[in-house]
Amino acid sequence: MSLLEQLDKNIAASGGLIVSCQPVPGSPLDKPEIVAAMALAAEQAGAVAVRIEGIDNLRMTRSLVSVPIIGIIKRDLDESPVRITPFLDDVDALAQAGAAIIAVDGTARQRPVAVEALLARIHHHHLLAMADCSSVDDGLACQRLGADIIGTTMSGYTTPDTPEEPDLPLVKALHDAGCRVIAEGRYNSPALAAEAIRYGAWAVTVGSAITRLEHICGWYNDALKKAAS
């Protein structure tokens, strides 16, 4: 059974939750052993996969969990706005560290390495390639280039203003076009995640609402301050 077939089976059985275990940079939680513990807890709670950033975090997590890991490396580049797995060396390092799926930025922006080359490198390692996209055009272009999975990860993050709500219409449009879609980005409640499935998502990635304690506390603090004013 292929990994996609196994994921199809697991998603059908448990609902398709993927947990992104990426603490706020510099947080007390931003340590490989804590990231790995989060991932293990997510697996034990029914997550079908986890999304992990960074080689040290990935290695530690791989030693603890059995679910597939979506691996990424984030970089801040002077010459490009692309942050997610921009280099071929990043793909190689993620493959060696134990990722089963490698995600790359799939947007049509200036970049050091073409999306096509990154996807080909992932497949060279016999791994699944995921493209983090911002639009229907991005998603369809990456699908044509061979991406196995299209994520809505970048929707709302390539423009000056980021909406509060997730991009459900993008999920539907990509699904209707025949893409295997992971809904990602601002799915901050179970209701929104469930709505993504109704719109055609294959699975839903949730990050901040589960693993970023500072964000969750901020939401509660803001609500309490408004109630008290």
Curated annotation (Swiss-Prot):
Keyword Isomerase applies: yes
User: Where is the secretion signal located?
Assistant: none
The pathway it acts in is:
Amino-sugar metabolism; N-acetylneuraminate degradation; D-fructose 6-phosphate from N-acetylneuraminate: step 3/5
State the organism named in the record.
Salmonella typhimurium (strain LT2 / SGSC1412 / ATCC 700720)
Q: Which reaction does it catalyse?
A: an N-acyl-D-glucosamine 6-phosphate = an N-acyl-D-mannosamine 6-phosphate
CDD domains assigned: NanE
Query: Which protein are we looking at?
Result: Putative N-acetylmannosamine-6-phosphate 2-epimerase 2
Q: Which UniProt keywords apply?
A: Carbohydrate metabolism, Isomerase
One annotated Gene Ontology cellular component of this protein: cytosol
Q: Which family does it belong to?
A: Belongs to the NanE family.
